[in-house]
């Protein structure tokens, strides 16, 4: 699988799972209506896990322009590949969102709250204080990137008899998923934690 296709499929699955849980919790007449923030943050974390496991062996599973750009700035990813990765991520995100809309179309039609409908596809601040909202997103994105840099550091070693690769595509999916989960639980209440440019 090419890195472009891996980023596309991994991001599509991430958005399908993440947007799907928001639709399930926030739209009218769903089985998960009203399940709450813990359900949303947990499913987003598991969506990250799924996307990383699928894309990791082929692309490193950036699944996020902030990761691609951050790794390029840090000198661990070639700038010449950034546009290809981001294009795959954007197309994958659009396809994932389209699938969420198709699956929940009847529930979008049954929902009278335009903010709930919009919230399936984007984040927005709970209290509009843009400098504080920006700070929260910046800190959350820093936390995500710090963990990603730690996991992808070539100086880290792991001794084992296993032949499984260590990195974002295997064992590395667990700390990335937990990081997204804890960012959502701790910092996501203010903006919905896009942690993405």
Task: Describe the predicted segments one by one.
Residues 1-197:
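Membrane-interface helix-loop junctions and terminal tails of multi-pass membrane proteins
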């Amino acid at each position: 699988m090419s890195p472009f296709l891996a980023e596309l499929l991994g991001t599509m699955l991430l958005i399908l799972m993440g947007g799907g849980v928001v639709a399930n919790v926030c739209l009218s007449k769903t089985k998960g209506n009203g399940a709450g923030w813990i359900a949303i943050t947990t499913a987003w974390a598991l969506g990250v896990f799924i996307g990383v496991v699928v894309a990791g062996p082929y692309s490193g599973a950036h699944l996020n322009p902030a990761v691609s750009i951050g790794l390029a700035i840090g000198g661990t990813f070639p700038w010449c590949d950034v546009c290809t990765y981001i294009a795959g991520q954007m197309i994958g995100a659009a396809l994932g969102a389209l699938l969420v809309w198709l699956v929940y179309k009847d529930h979008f039609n049954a929902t009278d709250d335009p903010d709930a409908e919009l919230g399936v596809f984007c984040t927005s601040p709970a209290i509009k204080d843009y400098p504080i909202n920006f700070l929260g997103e910046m800190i959350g994105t820093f936390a995500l990137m710090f963990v990603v840099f730690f996991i992808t550091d070539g100086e880290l070693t792991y001794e084992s008899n296993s032949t499984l690769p260590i990195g974002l595509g295997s064992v590395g999916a667990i700390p990335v998923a937990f990081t997204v989960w804890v960012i959502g639980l701790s910092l996501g209440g203010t903006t919905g934690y896009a942690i993405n440019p």
